[in-house]
Amino acid sequence: MASSSVPPTAVPAATAAPGAGFGFASKTKKKHFVQQKVKVFRAADPLVGVFLWGVAHSINELSQVPPPVMLLPDDFKASSKIKVNNHLFHRENLPSHFKFKEYCPQVFRNLRDRFGIDDQDYLVSLTRSPPTESEGSDGRFLISYDRTLVIKEVSSEDIADMHSNLSNYHQYIVKCHGNTLLPQFLGMYRVSVDSEDSYMLVMRNMFSHRLPVHRKYDLKGSLVSREASDKEKVKELPTLKDMDFLNKNQKVYIGEEEKKVFLEKLKRDVEFLVQLKIMDYSLLLGIHDIIRGSEPEEDGPVREEESEGDGDCGLTGPPAPVGSYGTSPEGIGGYIHSHRPLGPGEFESFIDVYAIRSAEGAPQKEVYFMGLIDILTQYDAKKKAAHAAKTVKHGAGAEISTVHPEQYAKRFLDFITNIFA
């Protein structure tokens, strides 16, 4: 038996006519789908199963009402919840007791729209096939089957930080028209299974969904303890750091105009982070080698369209909703197949939004993926204590990672400006 508790600002359409009690305009954006029933997913991992079931439930609920004309302060505090008990009919697919909560559903709906992501494509990318586990330094890290979205398990403290900064983040995205190197936050959820809470943050994948990354760096502009460990370096795709970048004489070869646009965007984003007293962020740099990428790989990963069955998770998603033009959403990266075929190193900039191709005449034919990550750390008492401890250990002049937000930003920008050839 399912029971849901939803605040007045998010009354489900089952209990109110679309738009009733809301300040919504009668005219809405054209949607290419018809409403589907929530499908039940089957997953070996109960957490993943409940998460995907909850996302489908949430998107279906949101599709019942038009988006608000403007977001109100209450939208940044709102949440929608559903609690399911004695779910015996689907006990082989889902736990018999679970809870699912979406934070600020209207805000993230608006953010998805501003980032050019349709809700039904978002749903398909997340749920048509099971997400796969990926290596993440902190907590669990999943990637959607079409590789356009990442699902990061975060702490309750991260959720609290996101909550406190969400209004500022949304305002900034509106101001810059979504043209940013910041992470594109698309959804924030809590999943409760066996009385344990897990918190999930969904973001756009900064790397390409079709061009594999052959090298990657996490750059902070600090040189102390900023070299990948021997254990990290033996991985198939290690996360290298600042000292590795310098020791390898690595450079980023992009055109002057692309460099100018990138640095202007970076400076604007970093100024925003300084205003919020945020630090410890990194530039994530992924490098796709076009020559290597065009060579067939003997033991490369099997692409979704080539594989049979539903994979180890056994996850079954909903059929794609039928569109008003007789089409079905194909996920965030799906529409690329209806356009011209892409050659080696080519990409669609509206999907691979963090990608820049190397300049003509560059010594290496490469595609670079560059974006800011780990932007939730604010300068607080813990950081102040860590800074004091590192100053004692390394000396006041050392290039240590924990400094004041303004110092961090200056050092970070100085370093990133010099990664270009």
From Swiss-Prot:
Organism (species): Bos taurus (Bovine)
Keywords: Acetylation, ATP-binding, Cytoplasm, Endoplasmic reticulum, Kinase, Lipid metabolism, Nucleotide-binding, Phosphoprotein, Transferase
InterPro entries: PInositol-4-P-4/5-kinase_C_sf (IPR027483), PInositol-4-P-4/5-kinase_core (IPR002498), PInositol-4-P-5-kinase_N (IPR027484), PInositol-4/5-P-5/4-kinase (IPR023610)
Keyword field contains Ion transport: no
Record GO biological process: 1-phosphatidyl-1D-myo-inositol 4,5-bisphosphate biosynthetic process; negative regulation of insulin receptor signaling pathway; phosphatidylinositol phosphate biosynthetic process
UniProt KW tRNA-binding keyword: no
Limits of the PIPK domain: 43-420
GO cellular component terms, A-Z: endoplasmic reticulum; plasma membrane
Annotated region (Required for interaction with PIP5K1A), positions in chain: 69-75
One function term, GO molecular function aspect: 1-phosphatidylinositol-5-phosphate 4-kinase activity
Catalytic activity annotation: a 1,2-diacyl-sn-glycero-3-phospho-(1D-myo-inositol-5-phosphate) + ATP = a 1,2-diacyl-sn-glycero-3-phospho-(1D-myo-inositol-4,5-bisphosphate) + ADP + H(+); 1,2-dihexadecanoyl-sn-glycero-3-phospho-(1D-myo-inositol-5-phosphate) + ATP = 1,2-dihexadecanoyl-sn-glycero-3-phospho-(1D-myo-inositol-4,5-bisphosphate) + ADP + H(+); 1,2-dihexadecanoyl-sn-glycero-3-phospho-(1D-myo-inositol-5-phosphate) + GTP = 1,2-dihexadecanoyl-sn-glycero-3-phospho-(1D-myo-inositol-4,5-bisphosphate) + GDP + H(+)
PTM annotation: Phosphorylated, phosphorylation is induced by EGF.
Coarse class of the protein's main subcellular location: endoplasmic reticulum
Annotated localization: Endoplasmic reticulum; Cytoplasm
Modified residues (Phosphoserine): 26, 349
Record-given protein name: Phosphatidylinositol 5-phosphate 4-kinase type-2 gamma
Residues the record lists as N-acetylalanine modifications: 2
Tree of life domain: Eukaryota
SUPFAM superfamilies named among the record's database cross-references: SAICAR synthase-like
Function, as annotated: Phosphatidylinositol 5-phosphate 4-kinase with low enzymatic activity. May be a GTP sensor, has higher GTP-dependent kinase activity than ATP-dependent kinase activity. PIP4Ks negatively regulate insulin signaling through a catalytic-independent mechanism. They interact with PIP5Ks and suppress PIP5K-mediated PtdIns(4,5)P2 synthesis and insulin-dependent conversion to PtdIns(3,4,5)P3.
Region entry Disordered, spans: 294-328
Biased composition (Basic and acidic residues): 294-304
EC number: 2.7.1.149
Assembly information from the UniProt record: Interacts with PIP5K1A; the interaction inhibits PIP5K1A kinase activity.
